[in-house]
Amino acid sequence: LSFQQVKEKVCKVEAKIGKKLPFC
């Protein structure tokens, strides 16, 4: 996976649990 793909996946999970990571 590219960094961009990983970032997108992580940001989707963070959105579901109501958190926002700095890079999202």
From Swiss-Prot:
The modification Cysteine amide is found at residue 24. Expressed by the venom gland. GO terms for cellular component: extracellular region. Keywords: Amidation, Disulfide bond, Mast cell degranulation, Secreted, Toxin. It is found in: Secreted. Disulfide bonds join 11-24. The keyword Ubl conjugation does not apply. GO terms for molecular function: toxin activity. Wasp venom peptide that acts as a potent mast cell degranulating peptide without hemolytic activity. Shows neuroprotective effect, since it prevents the death of dopaminergic neurons of the brain substantia nigra region and recovers motor deficit in a 6-hydroxydopamine (6-OHDA)-induced murine model of Parkinson disease. Belongs to the sylv/frat/paul family. This is Fraternine. It comes from Parachartergus fraternus.
